[in-house]
Curated annotation (Swiss-Prot):
Start-end of Basic and acidic residues biased regions: 655-665
Top-level taxon: Eukaryota
Protein name per its UniProtKB record: Multisite-specific tRNA:(cytosine-C(5))-methyltransferase
Pfam families: Methyltr_RsmB-F, Pre-PUA_NSUN2, PUA_NSUN2
Molecular-function GO terms, alphabetical: tRNA (cytidine-5-)-methyltransferase activity; tRNA binding
Family: Belongs to the class I-like SAM-binding methyltransferase superfamily. RsmB/NOP family. TRM4 subfamily.
One of the GO BP terms on file: tRNA modification
Subcellular location as annotated: Nucleus, Nucleolus
E.C. designation(s): 2.1.1.202
Gene: NCL1
Region feature Disordered, mapped onto this chain: 1-24, 650-684
Residue positions where Phosphothreonine is found in the record: 426
Record keyword Hydrolase present: no
């Protein structure tokens, strides 16, 4: 008799929840007023005066919850329809305690209708059953990477960057990773095996590891996470031991979402109200400029760079952009994006702004404590710079946070000419390390010790003729189109002992040529995981690599299954073949599966609907039983999306329902491999 899957809720987190109970408790108590902030932004006159009260009132209101559906997943349309058909009707015309609740709305400017906004108080989500069901849906889909919670305005920079599958992409200040996830999605648009890759960098070691946690959900072999100060991001060699200046990686696309004062986030970061002052923007200006200039150095000819902040302060925005244009001259230009993102209400960049010190005393160029780059460009410069091509998004325009976005295009790759123009206000950007100016980000990095596992385990590529790999190639019928030179391990011996990873071919070259200069935190997806040694092949294919490997395997370990069989495997653990046969669920499946030798195998499930993708999932086949190798989160998601079963609402099975399986040991065990038997599912 099979065991029922354990649907215990455990320590399930709510969608987007964080341990900030005190902050939530004090939300209503905090005075959302700041006299200096109000005086400063009124003086700037960034929008018509009659909009001020609406702007301020919006800034004082909580930020709506927004989420987007992962566009690179083939079942994105299915997840969207699931939300629109099963949830949206129940969230429309809802009343709570005598008050009509706003229905979810689509973000009109986000491509393919994949982003939505819920402007609903948390008390409603907690107490209203329909909204609670939707929250459970969001929790499950978020856990498996089908959706991401992300502030609406934060979604803009990756879209206007226009990443294609063949691009090399650098995210200079990537944590916590929501924008990086968009870049990866764009890279994988319409292909499981893009030729490009994304390098995600953050200056803080701990935030780099948080970044890995966020991005692992996407299962991309085309991602590398590194830990460097963005101001001094190192040159990446294309080939090892090369001193040729032309043998340096230049990126097609670069995202510069720089550290900023964050005064556009005061709807969610309420402490901005009490902490805000002009000094924050003034103090970060040089750092922001250094990062932007470094990014422009790393940008390929005809490449595109997006500079963005979650600040509304011109000192952090147009002033930085203007100084870069001043330094680089006609080697770069600003891209007009007026025809992009139709439906997004935005304002143009400004060309004039005053400069104030901490006490709101206006300063002039040359005053002590100021940089010339703080100040507005001359009329002649302004006519050339086209700062109106910058984009400003104000909270009251579409019920969002505040944001600033600028798109640069590199017209001519002339690093030396631009370097000569750089003033002493910025460090020598072509240097390989921080030799001049010390900054706060660097100080934080020094204080925070790198986690013990960071960079202690090297990336060692394995000879494709290694005996362990040869067994895998033969057992699974891996074709020669798959690049077998991309397999690596993370141990000093270089021997495949527990896990073998794979990276895309382009990243393999980068890793090998830069092991002495890149602080690599993470790269690759698990390909093979070691299991029992007493079977024909002791390695199973980890399902996070299935989107790649399904294109390169022969059909000798693949068995077709019907939907009823899938449902049975999702609900029951280790069902016995005789039990499946007696229930007449899928006799053809049982007949074919029992003929296979023990070990890893795969099921191909047809949905019988051209609008819905088929499923390709891993199983462990024993002598007498079988087990579906997907994690709890994927199990819940598949049950709900395909069969309408809300597993999160199930009660925990009683002890009487659980029966010991004789062949439980036939399934790979966590104690023998050091890695969970459960892994994300893949689809074809």
């Amino acid at each position: 008799m099979a065991r029922r899957k354990n649907f215990k809720k455990g320590n399930k987190k709510t969608f987007g929840a964080r341990d900030d109970s005190r902050a939530q408790k004090n939300w209503s108590e905090l005075v959302k007023e700041n006299e200096k902030w109000e005086k400063y932004y009124k003086t700037l006159a960034l929008f018509p005066e009659d909009q001020w009260e609406e702007f301020k009132k919006t800034c004082q209101a909580p930020l709506p919850l927004t989420f987007r559906i992962t566009g690179s997943r083939k079942h994105a349309g299915e997840v969207l329809n699931l939300f629109k058909e099963r949830h949206l009707p129940n969230l429309t015309n809802v009343e709570f305690e005598g008050e009509k609740i706003k229905a979810p709305v689509e973000l009109p400017w986000y491509p393919d209708h994949l982003a939505w906004q819920l402007d609903v108080p948390k008390t409603v989500i907690r107490k209203n059953e329909q909204f609670a069901k939707t929250q459970r849906f969001l929790v499950v889909e978020n856990a498996v990477g089908n959706i991401s919670r992300q502030e609406a305005v934060s979604m803009i920079p990756p879209i206007v960057l226009e990443v294609k599958p063949h691009h090399t992409v650098l995210d200079m200040c990537a944590a916590p990773g929501s924008k990086t996830a968009q870049l990866i999605e764009a890279l994988h648009k319409d292909t499981d095996e893009p030729s490009g890759f994304v390098v995600a960098n953050d200056a803080d070691a701990r935030r780099s590891h948080m970044l890995v946690h966020q991005l692992k959900r996407l299962n991309s072999a085309n991602l590398m996470v590194v830990n460097h100060d963005a101001q001094f991001f190192p040159r990446i060699r294309l080939h090892g031991n090369s001193n040729n200046k032309n043998d340096v990686l230049k990126f097609d696309r670069i995202l510069c979402d720089v550290p900023c004062s964050g005064d556009g986030t005061m709807r969610k970061n309420v402490n901005v109200w009490k902490d805000w002052n002009t000094q924050a923007g003034l103090g970060l200006h040089a750092v922001q400029l250094n990062i932007l200039n470094r990014g422009l150095h790393l940008l390929k000819n005809n490449g595109r760079l997006v500079y963005s902040t979650c600040s509304l302060n011109p000192i952090e925005n147009e002033a930085v952009v203007a100084e870069a244009l001043r330094k680089w001259g006609d080697k770069i230009r600003l891209v007009n994006c007026d025809d992009k993102l139709p439906g997004l209400i935005r304002s143009k960049g400004v060309s004039k702004w005053p400069v104030y010190d901490r006490n709101l005393t206006e300063k002039t160029k040359g005053d002590e404590g100021t940089l010339d780059s703080f100040f507005s460009p001359s009329e002649e410069e302004a006519s050339k710079f086209n700062l109106q091509n910058c984009m400003r998004v104000y909270p009251h325009q579409q019920n969002t946070g505040g944001f600033f976005i600028t798109v640069f295009e590199k017209v001519e790759d002339s690093t030396e000419a631009a370097t000569e123009k750089l003033s002493s206000e910025t460090p020598a950007l072509e240097s390989e390390g921080p030799q001049t100016k010390k900054i706060k980000v660097e100080e934080v990095q020094k204080k925070e010790r790198l986690p013990r596992d960071a960079n202690e385990e090297p990336f060692v590529f394995v000879d494709p003729q290694h005996e362990a790999l040869k067994v895998c190639w033969d057992f699974y019928g891996i074709d020669n189109i798959f690049d077998r030179n991309t397999c690596l391990v993370r141990n000093a011996t270089g021997e495949p002992t527990r896990v073998v990873y794979t990276v895309c071919p382009a990243l393999k070259d980068v890793i090998q040529a830069n092991d002495d200069r890149l602080k690599i935190i993470y790269s690759g997806v698990k390909l093979f995981v070691s299991q029992r040694s007493d079977i024909e092949c002791s390695w199973r294919i980890q399902s996070e690599s299935l989107p790649i490997m399904k294109h390169h395997m022969k059909s000798n370990r693949i068995v077709e299954a019907n939907l009823e069989m899938l449902k049975h495997l999702l609900i029951e653990s280790f069902p016995n073949f005789d039990d499946i046969r007696s229930k007449n669920i899928d006799n053809d499946f049982v007949e074919k599966m029992t003929k296979l030798s023990s070990g890893c195998a795969f099921i191909d499930v047809s949905r019988n609907d051209p609008a819905k993708e088929n499923l390709f999932l891993p199983v462990w086949k024993g002598n007498k039983c079988i087990n579906l190798m997907v994690c709890k989160e994927d199990t819940h998601e598949l049950l709900y999306r395909i069969f309408g079963i809300d597993a999160n609402a199930k009660a925990t099975p009683s002890a009487e329902e659980k029966e010991k399986e004789k062949e439980t040991t036939e399934s790979p065990a966590e104690t023998t491999t050091g890695t969970s038997t459960e892994a994300p599912s893949a689809a074809n």
